[in-house]
Amino acid sequence: MPSESSLHCQVLVVGAGPAGGDLARRLAFQGVDVILVDRLTDLNRSAFSSAALPIASMQVFGLPAEVVGSRWRQWQLIGPGSATRSWASPQPLGVVLDFGALRRWQADQCLRWGGRVALGLQACCSHQEGERMVTLLRRADGTLLRVSSDWTVDASGQARALLGDPPPAQRPRDGLVRAAGLEWLLQVSLTCWERWADRLSFCLGSDWVPQGYGWIFPMQPGVLKLGVCRLVDPQRQQPPLGRLITELGRRLLPGEVFKVLDRHGGLVRSTIRRREPHQRGRLVGLGDAVSTANLLGGEGIRHALTSSAVLAPLLQEALAASGASTSAQQALQDYAPQLRRALGWRWSLSGRLARRTWLGLHEAKADGRLDQVLRGLDGCRAEDLSALLFGYRFERYGLRAMPYLLGWR
Ligand SMILES: Cc1cc2nc3c(=O)[nH]c(=O)nc-3n(C[C@H](O)[C@H](O)[C@H](O)COP(=O)(O)OP(=O)(O)OC[C@H]3O[C@@H](n4cnc5c(N)ncnc54)[C@H](O)[C@@H]3O)c2cc1C
């Protein structure tokens, strides 16, 4: 029988990704007794996210320069085929974060504001006992830690370690949509790096990555991120991601002798309409655990941070009101609707567009349609492209085009 020890706190946050790390630091700042745990023993490891963000997010979410890998001011879209289009701005448009540094910084902030951080702890299960949550965590040596808390937050990402997957959808198209990604961190020559610096480059079209896309993002001088991502299509046999990324490297970096510093990857799993329960009693979901990853660009960091900005004040109110006669469910009843409002009305539109675009992108006909859409962007400014890809402002390109884009025509 593994030995067991126990801890008490007001809020236990399971998962030190962008969502959990941000919530823990916000709550600690407000004087809440918070414990942040993660199964990783080192937050530098498994830095699976390519972590591209628009520049405004740095200020909106109060992120420091130390978490930035590089800045970019240009979009470059390669494909379908060999067509290359680029849009440049004189100003920085965004950043590529060092994902490990972001997680470390958040955990460090939580500690500095008086919170507790415990790594190498895997949450196994949780249940409610009266008005407290009891969560069992396993250490690498098999011993157990029992944490009793007023609230437990499942910020374990797409794994949804405590909340579990949403109940089977009434309509099959409302279920979880999955995307799989693989990324290599490459050491390249400075001459090679300079060709890709300052820009986000995406490869689009079925001859690059069927049902998905590839990318090269710059990090600090001499380091690039090379990645592939695609929607999982159970109806189709899909080529292995390892083969696709090797081929991408061969085509984009011809003749370059690069060193692979790290290989990482992961899954993104989200529902399109985000109607799943966000809470079960005193267990609350945050970030990817409640489908805040957007499937159009596999982008979830901003939205994970948004979910914690919404939840933090509501949790504080709920803690302040503890003892009053409101139930846990009532105390956080505004969470899901407020988060839906914060993500905006274009959210599920972008998800449907993602499903249609990526799943359909496996043949020349779809490449032709994509090429037409990209041609329509030729006269845009780089800032307009950011508004489209980060702000999901499809209506700018004509409401008449939307039914076509969404597959209603
Ligand atoms: C290949 C790839 C590329 C991406 N690129 C981008 C990008 O460019 N821009 C962008 O915005 N987003 C990107 N994303 C998505 C983004 O990384 C996620 O949406 C974001 O990290 C979600 O944050 P989170 O905190 O909700 O979950 P996560 O970041 O997944 O964090 C969850 C944490 O919980 C821990 N955990 C899981 N289970 C347990 C358990 N049982 N016990 C304890 N701890 C546990 C994990 O170790 C992890 O640290 C990418 C994703 C992938 C896979």
Regions flagged by a language model, labelled:
Residues 316-409:
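C-terminal helical "tail/cap" subdomain of flavin- and related membrane-associated enzymes
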Residues 82-103:
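Dinucleotide-binding Rossmann-like beta1-alpha1 core, especially the glycine-rich loop
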Residues 20-21:
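N-terminal Rossmann-fold NAD(P) dinucleotide-binding loop
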Residues 26-47:
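Glycine-rich FAD pyrophosphate-binding loop
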Residues 109-254:
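Predominantly flavin-linked oxidoreductase catalytic cores and closely associated redox partners
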Residues 40-77:
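N-terminal FAD cofactor-binding segment of flavoenzymes
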Residues 4-17:
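Beta1/beta-strand and adjacent pyrophosphate-binding region of the FAD-binding site
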Residues 234-314, 318-320, 327:
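FAD/FMN-dependent oxidoreductases across multiple families
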